[in-house]
């Protein structure tokens, strides 16, 4: 059986943890930041865990993660 290919777009966006979960960036932190409070921006700078409903899709895109 041939090797499975990793989806490079997913590899750039997600990072696997040691426990098998995936981390992702938060949305709403690219532009239009003037009206957001520093607390909001600090919170948006942190990583979030991919929801379990999306976990299977990410796993299929990154078979060796």
UniProtKB/Swiss-Prot annotation:
<dbReference type="Pfam" id="PF01632">
    <property type="entry name" value="Ribosomal_L35p"/>
</dbReference>
<dbReference type="GO" id="GO:0022625">
    <property type="term" value="C:cytosolic large ribosomal subunit"/>
</dbReference>
<comment type="similarity">
    <text>Belongs to the bacterial ribosomal protein bL35 family.</text>
</comment>
<keyword id="KW-0687">Ribonucleoprotein</keyword>
<dbReference type="InterPro" id="IPR018265">
    <property type="entry name" value="Ribosomal_bL35_CS"/>
</dbReference>
<keyword id="KW-0689">Ribosomal protein</keyword>
<protein>
    <recommendedName>
        <fullName>Large ribosomal subunit protein bL35</fullName>
    </recommendedName>
</protein>
<dbReference type="InterPro" id="IPR021137">
    <property type="entry name" value="Ribosomal_bL35-like"/>
</dbReference>
<dbReference type="InterPro" id="IPR037229">
    <property type="entry name" value="Ribosomal_bL35_sf"/>
</dbReference>
<dbReference type="InterPro" id="IPR001706">
    <property type="entry name" value="Ribosomal_bL35"/>
</dbReference>
<dbReference type="GO" id="GO:0003735">
    <property type="term" value="F:structural constituent of ribosome"/>
</dbReference>
<dbReference type="GO" id="GO:0006412">
    <property type="term" value="P:translation"/>
</dbReference>
